[in-house]
Amino acid sequence: MSNVAVVGTQWGDEGKGKIVDLYTEKADIVARFQGGNNAGHTLVVKGRKTILHLIPSGILHDNKTCVIGNGVVFDPLVFLQEIEELQQGNLLPPHTKLFISERAHLIMPYHRSIDQAREARTSGKKIGTTGRGIGPAYEDKVARTGIRVGDLYEEDLFRDKLRQNLEEKNFLLTNYYKDKPLDVEEIATQYLSYGQKIKPYVADTSLILDFEIKQGKKILFEGAQGSHLDVDHGTYPYVTSSNTVSANASCGSGIGPNTISTVVGICKAYTTRVGEGPFPTELKDDIGNHMQQVGQEFGATTGRKRRCGWLDMVLVRQAVRVSGISALAITKLDVLSGLDKLKICVGYESASGQFTYAAPASMRVLSECQPVFEELDGWKENILHAREMNDLPVNAKKYLKRLEELAEAKIVLVSVGAGREETIVLEDPFHK
């Protein structure tokens, strides 16, 4: 058995889409296990950019099975739009199967309304939500008032749940947020129609995955966001509303944890963050601008500029520990080309002058921490055509070696450009 989970080691946007796309060639099945359409995976195939927010990145490969697991919050409109875009671009392979868990919770219009109204009202203390309704959908799931994909096929049950939910949500929208109420019948008609359109894809995906595992098939579990956006282990409250670490690959897919043999952590060669929250190594100078412009650091979902800074190995080490990462894939190494000096954060110094290798849980304490850097020499060479480690400049290899030492995890892949072919593959995680 050789099943692989891929998770981000930072605040998302690490380049997971490209890596998942590459690893899909070795896998039989690709499964999304958490999040929703608040994350965007950017893929470049044959010079064409494709951004997927909900459908697993493996959809571009033929003879694969793609699964949207029970841990995902599912927006049927976004799903149907992505299917249509893939069909129009002639990007849907003829023999690839796609399934949606009947247990996945639906993102409803009132989730989006509340998400946006809440963020607009929160003056000075914004979380930086995408406004896609992800958080409110997870809130309803935990509160046991959520509506699941499978409920769309029991019309009386669906209407009853919707009516009860809207009674509460409309009261909140009109009386607290001073927003417009939503119409029960309009939503019911809309979502029941969605239900019929997505029906061919809906299944008990836990059973499908279990069957395929017993047949010896290889599964790639695709995480969204990054470890430090995890609702438990991230920079709370500046986090997403789900568990983004590897342990949720099991829970969010409906299979046992012993079925996952390898966890690959995706680590950008520098650090970025979208939205609010502490960022100890953030650069607001020419180097930060270089990273932002050369790396094209704009959110795939929101289009917002990403904040950029030096690589923070305190955060990466924590991600390695929490997710049990044994293999690292380094992305966007090419963005650092041309910089005279490179810095790596190896620890923090607190406001009281104490040195620590670990990130504090308190956001106040973290925001007061100063990064402690190691400095390395950079390189001038263009590395886009590197296909083996020996093709890289000496200083690039030294940089990677130091990252490996600090993370205490082996580098198995280095991405030197956006294209599939612009990659140095050192090990196949499916053959461990």
Regions found by a protein language model. Give the residues of each.
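Non-transmembrane, aqueous-exposed alpha-helical and coiled segments at domain scale
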Residues: 1-432
